Amino acid sequence: MKQPIEKTFHRNGQLREVVPLRNGRRHGIVRVWHKNGVLANEERYQNGLLNGVCRQWSEAGRLLGEYRMVHGTGVQRTWHENGRLQLEFSTVRGDFSGRYRLWLNDGKLMSEEIYLNGRPVAAEEYRAACAKDKSLPKWTGKAGKPLPNTVATEKHIHEVFVRSLLAQKNRAEVRKWLENGGKAVRSLGRFKRKADALIFVEALYKAGTTEVIAPDIYAGRAGAEFADCLLVRLPKIAAKRRAIRKVCAQLSKRKLGAFQPDKDIGESHLFLSQS
């Protein structure tokens, strides 16, 4: 019997993910591609559990890192595009057990937790469990100091994310990008027509934004281009900031996208996701 394979695609038609299955579980090499066709991830599975060397690459094709798993046991990692560690966590036979840490792309620790058999626990409980079960990852070193849970931290996290998008080379002011495409396809998120996308962008400018940017434009066939998110620059005037959020809220109401942050925290840009 032939092994079933699930495939998904990016909006530009580029293959996104290939997942081989056996008895409904991942079995074989799972591969994920960036929108530009470059291989992004390669993970080896056996009967639903990671088993073997897993690797991650940047959009430019640079190897960001790799790790080895043995039947669902090991330390899994992901990396930011700039090469810094993004996520690190331990699993034992597929269940979270051990330290779970998450970093921003500026290197700051965003969160750190301890898991035991898939649930978060205190350090004391985990150490006691380790004394009884030698298969659990040892707790070594000191606990980190994640960023405090404050509005200032929320703003910092958002601004770091915005800066990473603004650093993209394949960005453009969205109105010019939509209008200068000629007969070639210019597709913005879930808008079915370019004219509808332009109406929305014009509403943002009318509300008071000074710039609407498509930060991650990617190519398709025959000159087609696609964008799945926007950055909306916010003015300092409170009334205009509220008006812009009101326009974005209509987008969410029509199920054409979502925006962040959901409340004003003094951010420089709103992020609109339309994927």
What are these regions (language model features)?
Residues 135-235:
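Long, contiguous N-terminal structural blocks used for assembly/anchoring
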Residues 26, 96, 228-233, 269-273:
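Generic recognition of long tandem-repeat/solenoid scaffolds
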Residues 1-139:
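Glycine/tyrosine- and acidic-biased, solvent-exposed loop/turn segments at the edges of beta-strands
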Residues 249-275:
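Acidic, proline/glycine-rich low-complexity IDRs
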Residues 90, 213-221, 257-262:
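Short amphipathic beta-strand and strand-loop transition segments with alternating hydrophobic
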